[in-house]
C-alpha cells in the first residue's frame, strides 16, 4: 500500500494530469474517507490540500471537500467535526419527529445545528473565497434536476448554502 502513496510525494517533474478528490455522502463513508485521508497525509508527508488539484463532494462528502479546499484543513482536524459532540449538535432531532405519528411530514433533524457548525468554519464566506477548485453536488426535488455549485461557476453562493444544498435530504435535513 505504501507504493500507492508515492504518487502524492513531491516530484521534480510537473505532473501531466490533475488529481481530483471525490468524496461520497453518507456519514459512515465520510468518516471512513477521513481515516484514509489521515493515512495519506501521514504516508506522503503532505496535506491533502497540497496533494489534490480539485475537491468534489456530495452530502457529507461536500462538507469534507469544502473544509479541505477552503483553506487546507488537515484530515486530523476535519475528524473532530465527526465526533459525538459535533454530531449531537448537527443532528438535533426535530420537535415534530418525536411526536407519535406514522407519517412524518418534516425532516428528522433541524438545520440550525448543522448551519451553526458550518458557520464556525466558514462564517459568511462565499465559494469565491475557497482556495482550491471545489464542486458540490445537489438535487433540486421540485425541478427534478441536478444542481452543481462551484467556486469557479457560482462564486457568489455562500459556502454554507452550497454544503447545505448538497446535504439536504427531505427525510433528514431541510
Regions found by a protein language model. Name each.
Residues 1-4, 20, 116-120, 129-131, ...:
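Short amphipathic alpha-helical surface micro-motifs
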Residues 1-5, 49, 83, 136, ...:
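Generic intrinsically disordered, low-complexity segments enriched for polar/acidic and small residues
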Residues 1-22, 141:
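Small-residue-rich anion-binding loops in enzyme active sites
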Residues 8-13, 44-49, 119-132:
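Surface-exposed acidic, glycine-flexible loop patches that form ligand/cofactor-binding
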Residues 14-22, 27-118, 148-150, 158-163:
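Patatin-like phospholipase
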Residues 127-174:
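Active-site gating loop/helix substructures
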Amino acid at each position: 500500500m505504501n507504493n500507492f502513496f508515492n504518487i502524492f510525494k513531491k516530484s521534480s517533474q510537473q505532473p501531466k494530469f490533475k488529481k481530483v478528490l471525490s468524496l461520497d455522502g453518507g456519514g459512515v463513508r465520510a468518516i471512513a474517507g477521513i481515516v484514509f485521508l489521515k493515512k495519506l497525509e501521514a504516508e506522503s508527508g503532505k496535506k491533502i490540500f497540497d496533494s489534490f488539484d480539485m475537491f468534489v463532494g456530495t452530502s457529507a462528502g461536500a462538507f469534507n471537500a469544502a473544509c479541505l479546499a477552503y483553506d487546507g484543513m488537515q484530515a486530523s482536524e476535519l475528524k473532530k467535526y465527526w465526533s459525538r459532540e459535533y454530531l449531537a449538535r448537527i443532528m438535533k432531532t426535530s420537535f415534530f419527529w418525536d411526536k407519535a405519528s406514522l407519517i412524518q411530514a418534516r425532516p428528522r433533524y433541524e438545520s440550525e445545528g448543522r448551519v451553526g457548525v458550518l458557520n464556525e468554519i466558514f462564517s459568511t464566506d462565499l465559494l469565491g473565497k475557497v482556495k482550491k477548485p471545489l464542486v458540490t453536488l445537489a438535487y433540486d426535488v421540485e425541478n427534478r434536476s441536478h444542481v452543481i455549485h462551484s467556486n469557479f461557476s457560482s462564486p457568489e453562493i455562500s459556502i454554507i448554502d452550497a454544503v447545505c444544498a448538497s446535504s439536504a435530504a427531505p427525510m433528514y435535513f431541510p
